[in-house]
Amino acid sequence: MEQIAFRMQLDPAQAAEYERRHDEIWPELVAALKDAGISDYSIFLDLSDGSLFAVLRRRPGHAMDALPEQAVMRRWWQAMADIMRTNPDASPTASPLRRVFHLP
């Protein structure tokens, strides 16, 4: 399994709301992520500036690149757009992170 990480940006004043929305994540979104080959997905928040650090594993042959085409993914992005930095299509702005250290 490949592990990837990326950074997103939350409005720092919306930390509690971001966590609440993820505590109530839609079952159909969870299913779409798993069906795309994603597992062990965690998001960490830096409360000082709203930086989000996400890390996940994806299986070989994953379908992660097809997620933006799924209606549930687009609905989730719209639901989160009021509290995050987003692209014109409401997807969160995300910057890939390069691993610089790993302790197996």
UniProtKB/Swiss-Prot annotation:
GO cellular component, one term: cytoplasm
Positions bound to substrate: Y18, Y41, W76, W77
EC number: 5.1.3.32
Keyword tags: Carbohydrate metabolism, Cytoplasm, Isomerase, Rhamnose metabolism
Catalyzed chemical reaction(s): alpha-L-rhamnose = beta-L-rhamnose
Catalytic residues of the enzyme: H22
Pfam families membership: rhaM
Sequence similarity: Belongs to the rhamnose mutarotase family.
Record protein name field: L-rhamnose mutarotase
Organism, as annotated: Acidiphilium cryptum (strain JF-5)
Protein's gene: rhaM
